[in-house]
Amino acid sequence: MASLKNKHFMIGLTLTFIVALFSFLAAKLPILDKVGALTIAILIAILYRHFRGYPEQYSSGITFSSKYLLRFAIILYGLKLNIFDIIGQGSRLLAIDVGVVIFSIVMMLFVNKLLHGDKNIALLLGVGTGVCGAAAIAAVAPIFKSREKDTAISIGIIALIGTIFSLIYTAIYAIFSMTTNVYGAWSGVSLHEIAHVVLAGGFGGSDALKIALLGKLGRVFLLIPLTIVLILIMRFRSSESSSNGRISIPYFLIGFVIMALVNTYVTIPSALLNILNTVSTICLLMAMVALGLNVAFKDLKNRALKPLMTIIITSICLSSLAFIVVHWLYS
């Protein structure tokens, strides 16, 4: 019995790995490189669920990917941060980033209320839009006690919209006259995922990409204080409602902070850093596959339309406002 359980666990884990690896490699191909590995992974998983059903017998391995590998990926995500660079070179961008995070969450909740959408998904999308997309959503989902299907829907939406917006940014840069500093800063402070920032920022050249990444990593850095604030708010609400559900700091966020400090104070060989970043990406993709397998098409039809409209409106407002601020500061 135990050997059969282990076999089913390994099959479930292998399934998420194969789809993740395929998505990772497919995203390096022309055209698909614009779509992004996250979007590919989630779409394949949802389509698999639709045509083959949820592989219940292999759920232990799939759940392992959606929970533990996701948290491990977020821990390694901290290696992207160098706190000295963000606070030193990117102090002006960091100030904008604070406004971006606050605006994204508040605006998302406001639009969601007008559309009578799901508040939990709106919160996840607000944090994802303001901070760093899928990783941020996955990091705060336990704090909000979000369901896996809501987390998956939010990640799928933000991956899709972020890809579309990054392509729109490149078109705007190609058509209109814009300095590399303005374009890079605008991309960095307003696009959703690091991959989206790399896609759009890289179109403006190496100087634009450098500024874009500095702006984006400032938002990733803000995940640390943001999660602390969210935990305190949820604890306060929990005590007010006399709930016994205690909100604790997720251990993987502590690991995220430790990795950020390690990358700040310790010189890690670039070859090792590249390997760790690849491992982080694969683990994150495996988690996305596992989350995507929990989403049925009827869930998308019933729960995704209003959040999709909400994030589009919020992202347009954020991009417009961010451009005005960046143009004023960098022109």
Curated annotation (Swiss-Prot):
<dbReference type="Pfam" id="PF03601">
    <property type="entry name" value="Cons_hypoth698"/>
</dbReference>
<protein>
    <recommendedName>
        <fullName>UPF0324 membrane protein SAS0317</fullName>
    </recommendedName>
</protein>
<keyword id="KW-1133">Transmembrane helix</keyword>
<feature type="transmembrane region" description="Helical">
    <location>
        <begin position="247"/>
        <end position="269"/>
    </location>
</feature>
<feature type="transmembrane region" description="Helical">
    <location>
        <begin position="308"/>
        <end position="330"/>
    </location>
</feature>
<dbReference type="GO" id="GO:0005886">
    <property type="term" value="C:plasma membrane"/>
</dbReference>
<feature type="transmembrane region" description="Helical">
    <location>
        <begin position="9"/>
        <end position="26"/>
    </location>
</feature>
<feature type="transmembrane region" description="Helical">
    <location>
        <begin position="154"/>
        <end position="176"/>
    </location>
</feature>
<feature type="transmembrane region" description="Helical">
    <location>
        <begin position="217"/>
        <end position="234"/>
    </location>
</feature>
<feature type="transmembrane region" description="Helical">
    <location>
        <begin position="183"/>
        <end position="202"/>
    </location>
</feature>
<feature type="transmembrane region" description="Helical">
    <location>
        <begin position="273"/>
        <end position="295"/>
    </location>
</feature>
<feature type="transmembrane region" description="Helical">
    <location>
        <begin position="122"/>
        <end position="144"/>
    </location>
</feature>
<keyword id="KW-0812">Transmembrane</keyword>
<keyword id="KW-1003">Cell membrane</keyword>
<feature type="transmembrane region" description="Helical">
    <location>
        <begin position="31"/>
        <end position="48"/>
    </location>
</feature>
<dbReference type="InterPro" id="IPR018383">
    <property type="entry name" value="UPF0324_pro"/>
</dbReference>
<comment type="similarity">
    <text>Belongs to the UPF0324 family.</text>
</comment>
<feature type="transmembrane region" description="Helical">
    <location>
        <begin position="93"/>
        <end position="115"/>
    </location>
</feature>
<feature type="transmembrane region" description="Helical">
    <location>
        <begin position="69"/>
        <end position="88"/>
    </location>
</feature>
<keyword id="KW-0472">Membrane</keyword>
